[in-house]
Amino acid sequence: MRIGISGLQTTDLVAKSIKETLSDAGFESFYFKNNSKATLADLVIVLGGDRGVRNYLHSAIDVDTPVLGISESESNGVLAQIELKELPSYLNRIKKQDYVIEDVPRIGVKIDGKNTYPVLNDVSVFTSKSATLMEHILRINGEEVWHDSSDGVIISTPIGSSAYSMSAGGPIIFQAANVFGIIS
């Protein structure tokens, strides 16, 4: 199994340490900063906590390689669920393929008719002038299902539901739910 190692803020020392740990466990690994190389891996370890995983997923648009998010500090997150010091204990499970791959829903966005990268947390649309109402319509398959006026709208994935949308009064959405939150 080939494991790619990615992380924008990762020091060479940390990457070298992880490569050694993986090599000792019998894995072939390589460090990359250009996400086009992610397709060469069977699994990608992303360092830098939730922020590192978000950054990686935003730039790895067409990559379907499973990701293991690792926090380099003492705190776990939603996307980076293990700490760096725990990696050796997880390698045996990786070898046996004793893990579950979860699909993470993202929101496709077009700005001025051009696709942007798929959004992991949320999309916010506001007027350019503060305290000004805007009108928005939600259409699904061309059919209008919702019409509202407000100073903005937030569309959130389940992962993003515990971030900005929650602070705007939106619900926390169960991670496995196949829905988006719309907060107006």
Q: What are the residue ranges of the model-derived segments?
A:
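Short beta-strand segments
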Residues: 46-48, 69-71, 156
